[in-house]
Amino acid sequence: MYPSCRPRTPLPRPCMTFIATISWSAEAPVDTPVERSGKAVVSQHFGRAARSYDEHAVLQLAVGRSLVQRLPEALPINHALDLGCATAPFARAQQQALPDVQWQAVDLSSAMLAEAAERGRLDETYQPLCADAENLPLSTNSQGLVFSCFALQWCDPQVVMAEINRVLAPGGRLLLAVPLAGSLAELQSSWQRVNHRPHVNALPSLADWRSAAFQAGFADAQLQQQVMVEYYDSVKAIARRLKATGADHVSGASGLTGKNAWQAMVKEYEARRTQQGLPLTWNVLFLEAEKS
């Protein structure tokens, strides 16, 4: 039996501004090494955020709704994955868009899948699968669609794109949205002025994903980068929002942040305040591809 949900006091929702769109196509690879964090730790962080995720993942949900609008009208095989589904917030919209498709809600965190079940989003046509996106327990050429929103930034782009290509059937589609290097730039810069410890994860770049798509065989992949800015009332609100969505895990970080260091960082961040509030920038990649 899954634990019951307890009512929570929601954080104030940030304002969000769309800044720009830049588009690319897949091309010859660029060799850019990217470090990865331990998956067990990532799973634990997201598991702890399962109860609070839906209430606080404002940007993630907005990006996901945009991704749902890009769903194709038909698939070569009526099987699809929501890869890194979290609490499966897009389940109903996905089922409405593709009513004849059998979905699997895939996540590394069993707690996220339990929360999805608690919220009534899993059924006989939308079933859970606790699995690693880089090593899926699925047959080759078995899926007509892979949908993934704000989940694969923890993966090695080369490995996960090859695995996605493996499970997709010929003519199968990939719809991916993922934060890129340069996201949370204000937070990273403010911390760098205080100390050189890692406080923000080093995310893969657009070049990393473009190279991975090319290497995996998605020669005609379309990549579009959008810059989005959220505005918050305080640095504390930013930190609480990241923790509430499981995005507070930082690879290589150790120990607690001291009060003096925190206050110094807050002072640096406050210098960035605008009339709208404290900005937090996200670079978001939208990637669409078809397996040949």
UniProtKB/Swiss-Prot annotation:
It comes from the Bacteria. NCBIfam families: BioC (TIGR02072). Pathway: Cofactor biosynthesis; biotin biosynthesis. GO terms for molecular function: carboxyl-O-methyltransferase activity; malonyl-CoA methyltransferase activity; S-adenosylmethionine-dependent methyltransferase activity. Converts the free carboxyl group of a malonyl-thioester to its methyl ester by transfer of a methyl group from S-adenosyl-L-methionine (SAM). It allows to synthesize pimeloyl-ACP via the fatty acid synthetic pathway. It holds the Pfam family Methyltransf_11. This is Malonyl-[acyl-carrier protein] O-methyltransferase. Keywords: Biotin biosynthesis, Methyltransferase, S-adenosyl-L-methionine, Transferase. InterPro entries: BioC, Malonyl-ACP_OMT, Methyltransf_11, SAM-dependent_MTases_sf. It is an enzyme of class 2 (transferase). The lineage of its organism: Bacteria, Pseudomonadati, Pseudomonadota, Gammaproteobacteria, Oceanospirillales. Belongs to the methyltransferase superfamily. Its EC number is 2.1.1.197. One of its GO terms (biological process) is biotin biosynthetic process. The gene is bioC. It catalyses: malonyl-[ACP] + S-adenosyl-L-methionine = malonyl-[ACP] methyl ester + S-adenosyl-L-homocysteine. It comes from Alcanivorax borkumensis (strain ATCC 700651 / DSM 11573 / NCIMB 13689 / SK2).
